[in-house]
Amino acid sequence: MTINTEVFIRRNKLRRHFESEFRQINNEIREASKAAGVSSFHLKYSQHLLDRAIQREIDETYVFELFHKIKDHVLEVNEFLSMPPRPDIDEDFIDGVEYRPGRLEITDGNLWLGFTVCKPNEKFKDPSLQCRMAIINSRRLPGKASKAVIKTQ
């Protein structure tokens, strides 16, 4: 199997752009969280997100615009993160406990970003959310899958 060099080059350029943009986004989130008096969190992206952005020809500038709006929703994200995680397969559910949905989606009504919570890591103080998908669909509705949705302005 051969790798298309244009895709390889585009992916590496996009990865570098994501790295620099995410430093700025995470700084904005840290400052907004401090100003709101809530715990900060850290955003990451997956390689899968880069591949889908290239494959679906999603404009990264548009994606970054939505990522930058997350700083205005630190309270909602913190509320999501403060919920107890769903029990592992071998653990029992506790009656009456509302568990954190498996996925958080942030949307402007057209672009949908899907996040999952990363497993806690002792090296990092703040919890992390990893963006794994980006979909453009203005008619998309929240599905039956376990998720929470934050709508930006």
Curated annotation (Swiss-Prot):
Protein name per its UniProtKB record: Endoribonuclease RegB
Role, per record: Essential to the early nucleolytic processing of a number of T4 messenger RNAs. Specifically cleaves after the GG dinucleotide GGAG within consensus 5'-GGAGRAYARAA-3' (R is a purine and Y is a pyrimidine) sequences found mainly in translation initiation sites.
Originating species: Enterobacteria phage T4
Domain of life of the organism encoding this protein: Viruses
Coiled-coil annotated spans: none
Top EC class for this record: hydrolase
Keyword Nuclease (UniProt): yes
UniProt note on regulation of activity: Activity is stimulated 10- to 100-fold by host ribosomal protein S1, which also helps confer substrate choice.
Disulfide pairings: none
Keywords, alphabetical: Hydrolase, Nuclease
Gene: regB
Enzyme nomenclature, EC number: 3.1.-.-
GO molecular function list: nuclease activity
One protein family per Pfam: REGB_T4
